[in-house]
Amino acid sequence: MKARTLERVRPRVEHFARLMGVTPTSVSVTSAQKRWGSCSSTGKVHFSFLLAEQPPEFIDSVVVHELCHLVHHDHSPAFWDMVRRYDVHFRSKRYQPG
């Protein structure tokens, strides 16, 4: 399942990273079940294996969210402005894994 998730996520990370002008230091898939993704202070972006079963527009939303953390390391208004700028599927509703 992790390999399938990476196959689905990596092209979207590459697309949005290029569009947004950011570069993650690495992209990986984890066994996390309580969060869709995370971004470390060193630029490593991690995604839950559970994304493999989600629709493409949801994957894009998670990818954009995590890549925005490469610029804004918080959930400030500037962070959410950036999310809205790049995520055409932005929804205020929060989705919980599992």
Describe each PLM feature range.
Residues E66:
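Walker B catalytic acidic pair
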Residues M1-S61, L70-G98:
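Active-site-proximal or metal-binding-adjacent scaffold patches in catalytic folds
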